[in-house]
UniProtKB/Swiss-Prot annotation:
Gene3D superfamilies in the cross-refs: 3.30.56.10, Bira Bifunctional Protein, Domain 2 (3.30.930.10), Ferrodoxin-fold anticodon-binding domain (3.30.70.380), Nucleic acid-binding proteins (2.40.50.140), Phenylalanyl-trna Synthetase, Chain B, domain 3 (3.50.40.10)
Keywords for this protein: Aminoacyl-tRNA synthetase, ATP-binding, Cytoplasm, Ligase, Magnesium, Metal-binding, Nucleotide-binding, Protein biosynthesis, RNA-binding, tRNA-binding
Reaction(s) this enzyme catalyzes, per UniProt: tRNA(Phe) + L-phenylalanine + ATP = L-phenylalanyl-tRNA(Phe) + AMP + diphosphate + H(+)
Cofactor(s) required for function per UniProt: Mg(2+)
Localisation: Cytoplasm
Source organism per UniProt: Bacillus cereus (strain ZK / E33L)
Family, as annotated: Belongs to the phenylalanyl-tRNA synthetase beta subunit family. Type 1 subfamily.
Matches recorded under Pfam families: B3_4 (PF03483), B5 (PF03484), FDX-ACB (PF03147), tRNA_bind (PF01588), tRNA_synthFbeta (PF17759)
Residue ranges of every copy of the FDX-ACB domain listed in the record: 712-805
Molecular functions per Gene Ontology: ATP binding; catalytic activity, acting on a protein; magnesium ion binding; phenylalanine-tRNA ligase activity; transferase activity; tRNA binding
Protein's UniProt name: Phenylalanine--tRNA ligase beta subunit
Primary localization: cytoplasm
Length: 806
């Protein structure tokens, strides 16, 4: 929001405050002033000149030789290249010695043999942004009104002795998107009164209702619509003071009627629209929702295709404007316009925002409707606009307005105690001081024993709860005046939760095992969202309503797909050995309309070499058992290794013979295995193994306590055993049977060999176990170990039909 310092002085007396001081004060009150721009940019020596004579330069067709009265004893000769220079005009002249933007000094010169004592200026040459210059003067010099005084300071007439404050408004302070809103803010800061604009409206005997009727079909989207007629206007330039104020506000002047609607927009914050009444095609205005596919050509000469939730202003059949966004070209005010219908309305911000976004079309009006306007100013704004059109466009304002009013503005009363204000702010402000602040804010209130009951004006929709009033007091008191204090309260010793401690253990172990932590997107594409799920889920993944792209449109149900993307990316760049893990959330869909269930998972991917250079010079390739070994070590650290088993499994996207479910106390909590060859081919990777498991379920299991014992004084005895079993026999189950059969003396069982070679009978395999027998109190005899070992042999023969391999 650009605020003209001189324009602001019309509403609040701040002549004793400089623009920079005002900017500092506003910033300290909670509204950031991003900058203060001096409009004249160091320009001096520019006056109003009267062109007495103008003829073609004898040596150059595109130059004119002019004799110009600049208010001095003698007129001066100036050579000018502007096409619109002519005798009798009053123009801005930079005299010899004048300074223009960029410290450009005007000197006497000769152009094609003719002396030139100065320079006739375009607005751009005086430092005005070319985008703000009206089309009439965009390619030529500026022309003053005929009543401009010769020799007068041109910058004063152009209002360039002004400074503009740029406010960086947050969305909740839409009340300051207009000059009156800023005036209320400044008046509250300095404790001064707001001078509201005077409206001098003279109406004719004819009535607006004789020319137009208004009906609203979409009452929820448009609770208030007001129309007023102004006849017999004469389209021309708006007065100089209005043009300069609009340019200071960042708006390009167009014509008197259009400029007046923009001026009211900047003054009241109430968007208006002016229709050429004679182009409406009927004597009625109907506000309705658009028909699907309905088309309209807007003022920017673009044809727009509307949707059924867009709000339009129509003549009963044809769309004339996109409500709250932009008018239509068919009813545009042009130089031929004679009769004007003014629109002032209150459109629902959500409707305007959605329409604006759908059409990719934003305007000053839509920005204000989106954030919310003051509905109590709608009538006042249209009356003021009609008065200005009567005065500056020669129009005749017809009596009254036509309106469709379904708006109910409810009073808002918010209460707060003085005790709460001081407690929250850490101040000691008296109740009387707070009352003065509410008075300065123009908030009517009553006070009962230190409790303020504040009636919030409609212009401040951001004030809804007591904390908002606390903020208002804090802003006006000055955040810089709030005393600095140390935190109070009992200091407590912080500690990690059990889950945090376990997550740190997981990270520390996996990084020690050579895996790197990755953090991937929680959003994925529809085709990847349901890949590699730990548990099947028939419900559709949770989709975003407005995704930025299809690649990031749904919440993930597994961590593996995103990790595989990272591995594929690395392998494509010649980083063939990759080991990654991620601790992150998946999002399980629940009942429709409910939030998804968020569950923390651990996933990992390993490919390439597990060991690059052993001391013997060997290299070890990642395989199923390498990855399984990593998980076994992790489960051991977490104290759940004895509760974990593995079961062969078939999962979509996984190798059918090299995949297993991870089972905790009989419940599947994850999986481990190699990618299916087709999946590896799609990702352009080889020998890639993955795992994923639910940390919630692992952490929810009681961990075994860790015990420490002295280094044994007595030796242990080791026996190896190789048995032939069917290929379907699970080594894990056999290991468990061996441990139970060996009794107390058997301390450790390790599978050290699996053989399925040519020497084995079809359908058979060999499993070799190493068993360690030990008693901490004595040395075992060979007979004791043999007895325990024989029990083991008997158990595996009976349970699995195993045959001792010789």
């Amino acid at each position: 929001m650009f605020v003209s310092y001189r324009w602001l002085q019309e509403y609040v007396d701040i002549k004793d405050v400089t623009a920079q001081e005002l900017a500092d004060k506003i910033t300290k009150s909670g509204i950031e002033v991003e900058g203060v721009e001096v409009l004249n940019k160091g320009v001096k020596g520019v006056v109003v000149g009267h062109v007495l004579e103008c003829e073609k330069h004898p040596e150059a067709d595109k130059l004119s030789k002019c004799l110009i009265d600049i208010g001095e004893e003698e007129p001066v000769q100036i050579i000018c290249g502007a096409a619109n220079i002519a005798k009798g005009l009053k123009v801005p002249v930079a005299k010899v010695g004048a300074v223009l933007p960029g410290n450009f000094k005007i000197k006497k010169a000769k152009l094609r043999g003719e002396a030139s004592h100065g320079m006739v200026c375009a607005l751009q040459e005086l430092g005005i942004d070319g985008k703000l210059v009206s089309k009439e003067y965009a390619d030529g010099i500026f022309i003053f009104p005929s009543d401009a005084e010769v020799g007068a300071d041109a910058l004063e007439i152009l209002n360039l002795h002004d400074e503009v404050l740029e406010l960086g408004l947050t969305p909740n302070r839409a009340d300051c998107l207009n000059m009156l809103g800023v005036a209320y803010e400044v008046a509250a800061i300095y404790g001064r009164e707001v001078k509201l604009p005077a409206i001098d409206l003279q109406e004719t005997a004819e009535k607006t209702s004789d020319y137009i009727s208004v009906s609203v079909e979409a009452k929820e989207e448009n609770p208030l619509y007001i129309a007023k007629m102004v006849k017999n206007v004469k389209i021309g330039p708006s007065p100089m003071w209005m043009q300069t104020r609009l340019m200071a506000a960042g708006i390009r002047p167009i014509s008197n009627v259009v400029d007046i609607t923009n001026y009211i927009l900047m003054e009241y914050g109430q968007p208006l629209h002016a229709f050429d009444y004679d182009k409406l095609g009927s004597k009625e205005i109907v506000v309705r929702l658009a028909k699907e596919g309905e088309k309209i050509e807007t003022l920017d000469d673009q044809e727009r295709t509307l949707q059924s939730h867009h709000l339009v202003i129509t003549n009963g059949t044809k769309a004339l404007a996109v409500a709250g966004v932009m008018g239509g070209a068919d009813s545009e005010v042009t130089n031929e316009t004679v009769n004007v219908l003014i629109e002032s309305a209150y459109f629902a911000g959500q409707t305007v925002r959605r329409t604006s976004k759908d059409l990719g079309l934003r305007s000053e009006s839509s920005a204000r409707f989106e954030k919310g306007i003051d509905p109590t100013r709608t009538f006042e704004a249209i009356q003021h606009a009609a008065a200005l059109m009567a005065k500056y466009a020669g129009g005749e304002a017809l009596e009254g307005v036509v309106e469709a009013d379904n708006l109910q503005v409810q009073e808002r009363t918010v209460s707060v105690t003085a005790e709460k204000v001081n407690r929250v702010l850490g101040t000691n402000i008296s109740a009387s001081e707070m009352g003065t602040m509410f008075t300065n804010l123009k908030f009517p209130f009553t006070e009962v024993e230190g409790t303020f009951h504040v009636n919030v004006p409609a212009r401040r929709p951001d004030i809804t709860i007591s904390e908002d009033l606390v903020e208002e007091v804090g802003r006006l008191y000055g955040y810089d005046h709030i005393p600095v204090t140390l935190p109070s309260g009992t200091m407590t010793r912080g500690k990690l939760t059990a889950a945090q401690t376990k997550r740190r253990k997981v990270r520390r172990f996996l990084e020690g095992a050579g895996l790197y932590e990755a953090i991937t997107y929680s959003l994925t594409s529809a085709d990847k969202a349901k890949q590699y799920m730990v548990e099947p889920n028939e419900k559709a993944p949770v989709a975003l309503a407005l995704p930025m792209s299809e690649e990031r449109s749904q919440l993930r149900l597994s961590l593996v797909p995103q990790l595989l993307e990272a591995v594929s990316y690395n392998v494509a760049r010649k980083n063939d050995s990759v080991a990654l893990y991620e601790v992150g959330s998946i999002f399980l869909p629940t009942e429709e309309g409910e939030l998804p269930k968020e569950e923390q998972h651990l996933a990992g991917v390993m490919t390439g070499l597990a060991l690059h250079h052993a001391w013997q010079g060997e290299k070890k390739v990642v395989d199923f058992f390498v990855v399984k070994g990593v998980l076994e070590g992790l489960f051991d650290v977490l104290g759940v290794s004895n509760q974990i088993t593995y079961a062969p499994a078939k999962r979509e996207g996984m190798h059918p013979g090299r995949t297993a479910d991870i089972v905790l106390d009989g419940e599947v909590i994850g999986f481990i295995g190699q990618l299916h060859p087709e999946a590896e081919k799609q990702l352009d990777v080889k020998n890639t193994f993955v795992f994923e498991l639910s940390l919630v379920k692992v952490f929810g299991t009681d961990a075994e306590e860790t015990y420490y014992s002295a280094i044994p004084r007595f030796p242990s005895m080791t026996r190896d055993m190789a048995v032939v079993v069917t290929k379907e026999t699970k080594a894990g189950e056999m290991k468990q049977v061996i441990a139970e059969a060996g009794g107390e003396l058997l301390k450790d069982v390790t599978l050290f060999d699996l053989y399925e070679g040519e020497k084995m009978e079809e359908g058979k395999k060999s499993l070799a176990f190493s068993m360690n027998y030990f008693d901490p109190e004595r040395t075992l005899t060979d007979e004791e170990v043999t007895e325990a070992h024989n029990r083991v042999l008997t158990a595996v023969e009976e349970k699995f039909g195993a045959e001792l391999r010789k």
